[in-house]
Amino acid sequence: MAKKSMKNRELKRQLTVAKFAKKRAELKATIVNLNASPEERFAAVVALQKQPRDASASRLRNRCRLTGRPHGVYRKFGLGRNMLRQAAMRGDVPGLVKASW
């Protein structure tokens, strides 16, 4: 299991990303807009750089919902490989069956 502090840090990052998502999208649109003046585009770049580092969605890490494990997480289920296997063996995941050939 991941430490509580790591889980909380990731949760805090998710909240920060959600808080700044709209403003970041506006600034990025201004930066790519070729019709905007160079001063406006530069101001948008500066404003984007002044935002918190954790406001970027690329800082998020997929973690297992049950254990907080950072690696081996299946996006479709939101579970780590170990927890997914246990859930499948219990029959908690509909449609998922153990491979046999």
From Swiss-Prot:
Highest taxon, organism lineage: Bacteria
GO biological process, any: translation
Keyword Ribosomal protein: yes
Keywords for this protein: Ribonucleoprotein, Ribosomal protein, RNA-binding, rRNA-binding
A Gene Ontology cellular-component term: cytoplasm
Alphabetized GO MF terms: rRNA binding; structural constituent of ribosome
Keyword set includes Chloroplast: no
Signal peptide: none
Function statement: Binds 16S rRNA, required for the assembly of 30S particles and may also be responsible for determining the conformation of the 16S rRNA at the A site.
Assembly with partners or alone: Part of the 30S ribosomal subunit. Contacts proteins S3 and S10.
Family: Belongs to the universal ribosomal protein uS14 family.
Protein name per its UniProtKB record: Small ribosomal subunit protein uS14
Species, as recorded: Pseudomonas putida (strain ATCC 47054 / DSM 6125 / CFBP 8728 / NCIMB 11950 / KT2440)
Gene: rpsN
